[in-house]
Amino acid sequence: MAVACGQDGVAGDCRFLGDLFVMWLEQSLSAILYVLTLLPMPDFMKGQSIGGMLGNAGSTILWFADVFMIGPALVMIGAAMIFFLLRRVLTLGIW
């Protein structure tokens, strides 16, 4: 007969395994972040900004941004995020 978590006093073991997984995940992600911080920035990206790179991208990229309405889409995403956060604050996270 298999014993599930929470039966016959093994609930503590299940919590321990869950905590062990969380600790392993945290250490793994920290190691990946550490390795990424060791990588040097490419020379072509030094002193660049997103606006400067988009300005140098050419008319084709700007045409696609205009056709797909990237600007209004970002405004709508920002408005949705503000609405979500404001709703959470005003309803104390219930709704």
Curated annotation (Swiss-Prot):
Keyword tags: Host membrane, Membrane, Transmembrane, Transmembrane helix, Viral penetration into host cytoplasm, Viral penetration into host cytoplasm via pilus retraction, Virion, Virus entry into host cell
Any one cellular-component term (Gene Ontology): virion component
Protein family according to the UniProt entry: Belongs to the inovirus G6P protein family.
Keyword NAD in record: no
Membrane-protein topology: Multi-pass membrane protein
Subunit structure comment from the entry: Interacts with G3P; this interaction is required for proper integration of G3P and G6P into the virion.
Location within or outside the cell: Virion; Host membrane
Main function: Plays essential roles both in the entry of the viral genome into the bacterial host and in budding process. The formation of the G3P-G6P complex termed adsorption complex is essential for correct termination of filamentous phage assembly.
Keyword Membrane: yes
Signal peptide: none
TM helices/strands, residue ranges: 20-40, 44-64, 66-86
Protein name per its UniProtKB record: Head virion protein G6P
GO biological process assignments: symbiont entry into host cell
